[in-house]
């Protein structure tokens, strides 16, 4: 099984905090997509993931964010 690794920034586009364990790459309720921490994802999205909505990445033991399959 191929695992998708996140190569983007680990800083939340909304609150600018460094993301430590769970990262979301998702569409916001305002239209544009953003890299978000869990709190900002909850506050600024429709809280759904999938095609056209967003993806969730979880940090593994090597320190890489890996896409979590739905």
Regions found by a protein language model. Give the residues of each.
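Cys/His-rich Zn2+-binding "zinc-finger" mini-domains, especially FYVE domains
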Residues: 9-10, 17-22
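Flanking scaffold residues of small Cys/His-coordinated metal-binding clusters
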Residues: 6-7, 32
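Short Cys/His-rich "knuckle" micro-motifs
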Residues: 21-25, 47-50
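Short cysteine-rich clusters marking metal-coordination/redox-active sites
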Residues: 12-15, 37
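Short linker/helix segments within small regulatory modules
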Residues: 24-34
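Cys/His-rich microdomains that often coordinate metals
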Residues: 19-20, 35-36, 44
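N-terminal first-folded block
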Residues: 3, 10-11
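Short metal-binding segments enriched for Cys and/or His
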Residues: 38-68
């Amino acid at each position: 099984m191929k695992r998708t690794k996140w190569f983007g920034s680990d800083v939340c586009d909304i609150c600018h905090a460094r993301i430590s364990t769970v990262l979301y790459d998702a569409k916001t309720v305002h239209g544009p997509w953003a890299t978000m921490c869990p709190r900002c994802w909850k506050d600024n999205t429709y809280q759904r993931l999938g095609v056209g909505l967003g993806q969730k990445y979880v940090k593994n033991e090597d320190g890489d964010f890996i896409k979590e399959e739905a």
